[in-house]
Amino acid sequence: MNHYYVYIITNWNNKVLYIGVTNNIARRIYEHKNKLIDGFTKKYNVYKLVYLEEMNDVEAAISREKQLK
């Protein structure tokens, strides 16, 4: 069974939030912490996991991500 994760990460002072979806949360958090992906999270140094929700359906995960945004 596949697992998908909706997650929220923030910066050191909790001023900036990023909401995303992934099928590998450990890899994705590692990428954010080590600034391996150019974009919003690298620019704003967003890396601290503050919320995690697991789902079995990718469409449901994407829908939840949009709801949170």
Predicted regions and their residues:
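GIY-YIG nuclease catalytic motif and its immediate N-terminal context
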Residues: 1-38, 42-69
